[in-house]
Amino acid sequence: MKFAKKYEKYMKGMDEELPGVGLKRLKKLLKKCRSDLQSHENDGSSAGRCPGHCSVCDGSFFPSLLNEMSAVIGCFNEKAKKLLELHLASGFKKYTMWFTSKGHKSHGALIQQGKDLVTYAIINAVAMRKILKKYDKIHYSKQGQEFKAQAQSLHIEILQSPWLCELMAFYMNLRRSKKNNGAMELFGDCSLVFDDDKPTISCNLFDSMRVDISLTCSICLDTVFDPVALSCGHIYCYLCSCSAASVTIVDGLKSAERKSKCPLCRQAGVFPNAVHLDELNMLLSYSCPEYWEKRIQMERVERVRLAKEHWESQCRAFLGM
């Protein structure tokens, strides 16, 4: 079965109607564009390869795809955030959320909903990449690749969403629970892999569809500890990200200046809306307990030192010293 038919069948089979990529409509646009290009080439006109003379290029294709992917990422982030808040809540708040939540009364139901969300994210990401690849093939251009890069800077690339990584960790955390052993088969293709002590979360869906998320901090070059994901999608240790943003652990990442850039992609303004990856933090603490205990001791000493330096500098500033 071709991907377009598989995608259409998947979207129609969902329990509720969610935003998606209009593959059929976009492919019709490209088919019309291909016909126009071929007619220009048959006439011997060089305009056949000129994006400026293509009705698809100058307003129909990319704006439509941009709106659709914005709707998809917005829907995914909102639903993933609500699901994870329900799982991480404690005490009276958790009781209230479970009582008011409809249809999510069991851990098995939580796992299934999370599985559906991950599948939804990955299949829409693949749909976007395939239609952009088709666009470039028809137009002999790299505009599709340029759009994909633009999507990353606009934070509508769904594979860069921090909630995708959190959902994968969420599965493995629930799967670890003894009382949820019956639900382990629901998502057997998601795993935490260590290659030369370098951890990676891997996920396989739809045969050839695979997502790998590195869990090595590119600043300290160690396994991420107390991980946070910046708006650009890159994951760092909390202390490392504070250092990169030139803020103290007391003030936190929300106080970072908008001009502060991600150490990897150099995108500015990605620190204030960073997301703490609590599910991932739990997963790593269970998976490598000895390493985690050592990091806890080291981090505790470092955080006390940094907090002390911060308050001492505040006192000196207050006293005019």
UniProtKB/Swiss-Prot annotation:
Keywords: Metal-binding, Transferase, Ubl conjugation pathway, Zinc, Zinc-finger. SUPFAM superfamilies: RING/U-box. It is an enzyme of class 2 (transferase). A zinc finger (RING-type) spans 217-266. It holds the Pfam family zf-RING_UBOX. The keyword Cell membrane does not apply. Pathway: Protein modification; protein ubiquitination. InterPro entries: BAH1, SPX_dom, Znf-RING_euk, Znf_RING, Znf_RING/FYVE/PHD. One of its GO terms (molecular function) is zinc ion binding. Its EC number is 2.3.2.27. Residues 1-149 form the SPX domain. PROSITE patterns: SPX, ZF_RING_2. The keyword Metal-binding applies. It catalyses: S-ubiquitinyl-[E2 ubiquitin-conjugating enzyme]-L-cysteine + [acceptor protein]-L-lysine = [E2 ubiquitin-conjugating enzyme]-L-cysteine + N(6)-ubiquitinyl-[acceptor protein]-L-lysine. Coiled coil: none annotated. The RING-type zinc finger domain mediates binding to an E2 ubiquitin-conjugating enzyme. Belongs to the RING-type zinc finger family. This is Probable E3 ubiquitin-protein ligase BAH1-like 2.
